[in-house]
Amino acid sequence: MSPISPPEPEKQPEEPQEPKTEPETPQNEQEGDYYNLMDVSVKSTPEIDNIIANLKFSKFHLEVDPDETGSSIVIFGSSKSYKTTLLKRILKDYYSEDTITLLSAPNVHAKIYNDLPKEILRTDQYKPEIVKAMYYINKKTDNKYPFVIALDDVIDKKNDGDLEKLFLTLRNAKISVIILLQNIQLLKSTSRGNANIVIFRKFNQANVIEDYVMKMYLQNFYPFRDLKMADKVALYMKLTNNHHFFVLDVINNKLTIHMEPELRE
């Protein structure tokens, strides 16, 4: 007698499967409207390409005269964005041997500073006492000496009162300041608001460009003013990724763009 096989289990009806669909692309990520802003590569649009093709680059020139009055210059940009290269050009071209120049940087003895004029004083620490001494000297000599203090990535003095005075009042004592920072928030808002010239170089984060560069400074200037925010940021990244840079002359309410190769003349 052959063994009896157990009955096959009853087939359960299959649960209805939801149709598989690809996740929808967010509106700001549609083809031609999406920019991978966290990468070096930035997608473009015909509008952005047209703006770039018609941009007029200006010869680099700053409206500063240290013999007449002090100035305040800020250079913002990520690491490796040629901020120090530009600083050296400014010191050589605008602050003569008659200007007493002090450079303060944590790595002040690095090779990048080797080609600066020997007359430039150097220190690896910013000290408020130096600012006070400059002010005292010019107070006693009727503003005889033009001074300039250059601070390269001095990141821990945001709330220093004497640093703030360099932007607020000490320009009247013929004391100028040039400060280089990787983060716009590292400069106190009152100092940012009183800078004469603000220079913008490359940033790596799209949100930084949107929240600080655009919303605080550039969004209402040509070539950005008529673009939606994603395109403003993309245009900024596309230009500054080539190390071009923007100069905002606050006093004259003027924005210009400059080509990096000019700095290598």
Name the predicted role of every residue range.
Residues M1-P9, G32-N36:
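Intrinsically disordered, low-structural-confidence terminal and linker regions
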Residues P7-E29:
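Acidic, proline-/serine-/threonine-rich low-complexity intrinsically disordered repeat tracts
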Residues P26-L62:
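N-terminal pre-Walker A segment at the start of P-loop NTPase domains
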Residues S58-G77, L86, Y145, D162-F167, ...:
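P-loop NTPase motor core of the ASCE superfamily
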Residues I73-K92, A105-H109, L121-F224:
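Conserved P-loop NTPase motor cores
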Residues S96-D115:
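AAA+/P-loop NTPase substrate/partner-engagement loops
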Residues Y113-D115, S191, K238:
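Short, conserved catalytic or adaptor-binding loops enriched in Gly and charged residues
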